[in-house]
């Protein structure tokens, strides 16, 4: 990376500073590219008891240290009300309905690329920037969202619900880099976040056990655990604590005449409040041939007058899967070439055309794969 003086640009960019290494290096790179750069630290969660489970104070201090080091101003903004209304209430409603949501996707759409973008524009910014591992490309009069260059860190799955108009106002400096390069840049320039661990999990839960957190907001409704033959073999403490494909924490090991194969969650019967389980990592009911998705968001309009061959992910870090997508009266139906394991209602399916992230939606239902004949 050249150390020569950058050509000054007129564009003013406000970087979403999380207190992590990716946003830190993003701000530095933009400075080196000649942009007028400022930072903004978002607080999206307020604890009633004053306990900062999501390390907000530490993160703010790290963000401030980086901004001081590279010589830029740091703004702060509290989007906790917007987060509660537009992300957290939906998160609770999905769990109450027996689904397994992904709040990070809604947070990106409603907070980072809406509330933050609007706030930054109000402060006089021309553009915003984040430390996401994605890329953007302007083509044919619209802005496309592309996978990050580092396949191990690509975050396009989480940004699929952000519209092209918002992507067009956003920069992603580390999307062109691999993670080791980012840390090396941070270390070379003495940034406080150079060796800071990547954040994992959901911010508002932090280090707490997920079940303990959820109990604060949703009453647990215990019920039976049944096999696919209808035999009751245990009790669950609440359907919301379990997800399709789950193996750990079922409490049903060591049953007589059950064999040694581990038990897995195969489904949920919401009407009867029953958790359905089966044995074996390759249990047929763990695999699906197709899914139905709703609440579809496209980065840019997608033509689907006839079925279209695409690639898709039904979870983060999954390799792209070949499928055919068609629009039906019920929603968007994706039929896969190969069996898909543990397709989970409430999670997102995201569609790709090569490196271009087209968009995606929320999985409503999955169709079992017929291993006895044609799929």
Swiss-Prot record:
InterPro entries associated with the record: MnmA-like, MnmA-like_C, MnmA-like_central, MnmA-like_central_sf, Rossmann-like_a/b/a_fold
GO molecular function: ATP binding; tRNA binding; tRNA-uridine 2-sulfurtransferase activity
Residues binding ATP, per UniProt: 16-23, 42, 131
GO CC terms: cytoplasm
Keywords for this protein: ATP-binding, Cytoplasm, Disulfide bond, Nucleotide-binding, RNA-binding, Transferase, tRNA processing, tRNA-binding
Known EC number: 2.8.1.13
Positions marked as site (Interaction with tRNA): 132, 347
Major subcellular location class: cytoplasm
Pfam families named among the record's database cross-references: tRNA_Me_trans, tRNA_Me_trans_C, tRNA_Me_trans_M
Region ranges (Interaction with tRNA): 153-155, 315-316
Catalytic activities: S-sulfanyl-L-cysteinyl-[protein] + uridine(34) in tRNA + AH2 + ATP = 2-thiouridine(34) in tRNA + L-cysteinyl-[protein] + A + AMP + diphosphate + H(+)
Interaction with target base in tRNA: annotated segments: 102-104
Recorded family membership: Belongs to the MnmA/TRMU family.
Function: Catalyzes the 2-thiolation of uridine at the wobble position (U34) of tRNA, leading to the formation of s(2)U34.
Protein name per Swiss-Prot or TrEMBL: tRNA-specific 2-thiouridylase MnmA
Recorded name of the encoding gene: mnmA
């Amino acid at each position: 990376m050249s150390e020569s003086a950058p050509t000054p640009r007129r564009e003013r960019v406000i970087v979403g500073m999380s207190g992590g290494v990716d946003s830190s290096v993003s701000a530095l790179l933009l400075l080196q590219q000649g942009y007028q750069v400022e930072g903004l630290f978002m607080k999206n969660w307020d604890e009633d008891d004053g306990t900062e489970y999501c390390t907000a104070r530490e993160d703010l201090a790290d963000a401030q240290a980086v901004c001081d080091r590279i010589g830029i101003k740091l703004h702060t903004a509290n989007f906790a009300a917007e987060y509660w209304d537009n992300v957290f209430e939906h998160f609770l409603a999905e769990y109450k309905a027996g689904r397994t949501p992904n709040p990070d996707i809604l947070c990106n759409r409603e907070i980072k690329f809406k509330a933050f973008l609007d706030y930054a524009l109000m402060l006089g910014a021309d553009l915003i920037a984040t430390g996401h591992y994605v890329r953007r490309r302007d083509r044919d009069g619209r802005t496309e969202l592309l996978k990050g260059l580092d396949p191990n860190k690509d975050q396009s799955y989480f940004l699929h619900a952000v519209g092209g108009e918002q992507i067009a106002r956003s920069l992603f400096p580390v999307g062109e880099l691999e993670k080791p390069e980012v840390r090396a840049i941070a270390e070379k320039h003495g940034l406080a976040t150079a060796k800071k661990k990547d954040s994992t999990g959901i911010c508002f839960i932090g280090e707490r056990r997920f079940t303990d957190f959820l109990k604060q907001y949703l009453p647990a409704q215990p019920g039976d655990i049944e096999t696919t033959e209808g035999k009751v073999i245990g009790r669950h403490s609440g359907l919301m604590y379990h997800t399709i494909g789950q193996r750990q924490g079922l409490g049903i090991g060591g049953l007589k005449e059950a064999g040694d194969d581990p038990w897995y969650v195969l489904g949920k019967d919401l009407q009867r409040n029953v958790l359905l389980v089966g044995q074996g990592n390759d249990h047929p009911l763990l695999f699906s041939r197709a899914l139905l998705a709703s609440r579809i968001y496209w980065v840019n309009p997608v033509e689907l007058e006839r079925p279209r061959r695409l690639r898709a992910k039904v979870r983060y870090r999954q390799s792209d899967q070949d499928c055919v997508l068609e629009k039906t009266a019920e929603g968007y139906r994706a039929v896969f070439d190969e069996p898909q394991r543990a397709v989970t209602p409430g999670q997102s399916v995201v569609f790709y055309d090569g490196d271009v992230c087209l968009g995606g939606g929320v999985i409503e239902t999955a169709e079992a794969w017929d291993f006895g004949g044609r799929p």
